[in-house]
Amino acid sequence: VSKQEGVKNVFVRGLGDRYNATTFNGFPIPSEDPEYKNISLDFFSTDIIQTVGVNKAFNAGGSSDVGGANIDITSKELIGGGHFNIGVSGGFNTQTLTTDFLKMDGVNLLGIADKTQPGMENNYNFKNSLDPSEHDLQINRNYGVSGGKRFYVGPQKDALSFFLVAAHNTEYQYAEEVLRNTTTNGTIYKDQTGKVYEQKISQLALANLDYDYRNRHHLSYNFMMVHDNVQSVGDYDGMDSGKFNDDYDNMGFTRRQQANDNWLLVNQLMTNWGLTKTLSFDAGASYNVVKGSEPDRRINNLRKAAEGYTLLEGNSQQRYFSELNENDLNVKAGLTYRLADDQEEISNIRIGYNGRFVNDDFEATEYNMTVAHSSVFRLEDFSLDSYYNQENLKNGWFEIQRNVDKYTVKKDIHSAYVEAVYQFDAAWILNLGVKYDRVDICVDYDVNKGGEKGSGKIGKNYFLPSLNLKYNLTPKQAFRLGASKTYTLPQPKEISPYRYVGVNFNSQGNEKLQPSDNYNLDLKWDFNPTPTELVSLTAFYKYIKN
């Protein structure tokens, strides 16, 4: 398991975000960031999590949309009779202390961005300034509080407990970048240096309510809220012949101001009932809501001129608003019958059902502010607000063109499975299962300025066997064998042909993209020299088709 600098999510066995899966208390959980499949693990501090399991061998009862690992996070419950804690911390980055730090307009102290759009094209009604403000002495800070209490209710003194966590974090980063692109024959057509000022603001709230009835029936509710805002100002100066193609060595300046304001709400209800000494029933439902927005992204390009810099013509001056709304419903139920064995009494047969129903709605509005007559600017001190205003729009210095892109994705997954665990003796433990999944995905799109309209569908039936075998060679050594079939579904952004423009890249989905079939084989040797030490050797093979 590894994590790459600058990338939110982890890599497992060389497989990145789309091949891994994250569950929260056993339920699938979406990412707080629409660009990713998995939620960032940075949100889960030791104050929040009880355990984290990384499962690289798969069974019938687990996630099917996985190829690298399933990361299961169990939220913390109250231990003991009561708990209360307050934490405050601070720090600083020397680069942000000594730099006039640039902040974009339109984001408040809590990281909540102003998403107001101007509406009509013949009026310049943008609320946010194009000119970032300068700040100094940027201090990183973190606040957190957690607490809980256990009560005993009823004549049987049944346990009722709650646990709450709330946290706020603000941090600043400054980086100097180099953007360089070449043609296929190695000719450099883009060579720019950049200064990037980034501020990250996040809040997290978690609540757990837990009730035990007569030590046989269990009911729990979990809530989690994650708000994550990343805002940045990037100034890039240098040569770009693909953009600034003129007589001044193709030199120019680009300012990109961007805020990504994302919310994730999680609600989970779970119950477990001991029906008899050998039969138990469990069920649960989870409803997740993701709201991801990129409000008022501002891109301005200035080309080198005789007396300074002028605004580039065409669609090079842009303001952009996008919002993705995702509703994610998960349900599950299972019946477990415990079998008799002469060992650890872990043998059982289980049948179950999992269902996941996801709806994604995406809309992006782009305002191109086409230049007709440009002022001359000096990079040392310039104001774009002095040019882009209602008076200059009325006088014909520039015009506004508005375009809306939309796509929707609907995903339904029905899973039914049966699996068995049996311990033959002190050495051999077998887990054998099979799952049937029905996957239906529909995408409808009207994107790229109306140039691409259409729809696409994916309908698949999957039969997914799994085998896990453990052999205890000695009390300190064990061999494990795992074999399974899983799949990897394309993400919503990957099956819509919407074109996203980044700082140094463009990305576009393909509506004809198909799921991957994954064949997994694992062999592992574990050696425990002492109860607190572990030595492992693992060999694995994966065949990923499509």
Where are the model-predicted features located?
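Transmembrane beta-barrel wall of Gram-negative outer-membrane proteins
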Residues: 128-235, 265, 465-467
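Signature of Gram-negative outer-membrane beta-barrel scaffolds
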Residues: 318, 322, 338-339, 344-474, ...
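Membrane-embedded beta-barrel scaffold of Gram-negative outer-membrane proteins
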Residues: 280-286, 291-298, 348-350, 427, ...
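Extracytoplasmic beta-strand/coil segments of soluble accessory domains associated
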Residues: 1-28, 69-74
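Surface-exposed extracellular loop regions of Gram-negative outer-membrane beta-barrel proteins
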Residues: 27-28, 291-293, 359, 385-397, ...
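Outer-membrane beta-barrel signature, preferentially recognizing the C-terminal barrel domain
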Residues: 246-270, 401-414, 458, 487-544
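Short acidic/polar hinge/loop motifs at secondary-structure boundaries
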Residues: 27-56, 101-102
